[in-house]
């Protein structure tokens, strides 16, 4: 069974999908204690870590996993908000990038609002993709609508998926 670490876990929406697909949710990391309390209730066999992922010094304290999933805060990218290019939360994807470099997981999945793709004429999104590729991943992205997957709301999300280049070999 492949292990998963969930960054910016919230109460565990992404983790639930991975759990239902047969993955082992190893660790959830979030800076909001209330979110982790709910996560712990729903994922009794998983660890939680109340950490600020904006502090790269804490990344070494997170155990390695096969897959990293992350839903970084979206407020600075959202088309329903002020879309502030200088919002410090916009840089939190860098903690995912740093963890990829440190722990070398087989794959990652990052989820965010569709506004991420158009922020600053798409340049922010292009930079994020380049960074993930520079860490040794083949990266793809898709815009998905949650209503197409049984969720009773229309909610478009960007999913960025990376697979280690060396795993993409044809034998």
Question: PLM features: residue spans?
Answer:
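Conserved acidic E/D residue at the C-terminus of a beta-strand in Rossmann-like folds
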Residues: 29-32, 111-112
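Short alpha-helix immediately C-terminal to the canonical SAM-binding loop
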Residues: 33-37
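Conserved SAM-binding strand-loop segment of SAM-dependent methyltransferases
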Residues: 45-53
């Amino acid at each position: 069974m492949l292990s998963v670490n969930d960054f910016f876990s919230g109460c565990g929406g992404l983790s639930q999908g991975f759990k239902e697909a047969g993955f082992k949710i190893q660790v959830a990391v979030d800076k909001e204690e209330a979110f982790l309390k709910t996560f712990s209730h729903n994922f009794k066999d998983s660890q939680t870590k109340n950490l600020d992922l904006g502090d790269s010094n804490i990344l070494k304290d997170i155990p390695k996993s096969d897959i990293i999933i992350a839903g970084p805060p979206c407020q600075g990218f959202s088309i329903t908000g002020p879309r502030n290019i200088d919002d410090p939360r916009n840089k939190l994807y860098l903690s995912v990038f740093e963890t990829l470099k440190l722990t070398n997981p087989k794959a990652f999945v990052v989820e965010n609002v569709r506004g991420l793709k158009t922020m600053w004429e798409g340049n922010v999104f292009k930079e994020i993709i380049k960074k993930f590729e520079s860490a040794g991943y083949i990266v793809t992205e898709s815009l998905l609508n949650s209503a197409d997957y049984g969720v009773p709301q229309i909610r478009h999300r960007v999913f960025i998926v990376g697979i280690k280049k060396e795993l993409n070999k044809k034998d």
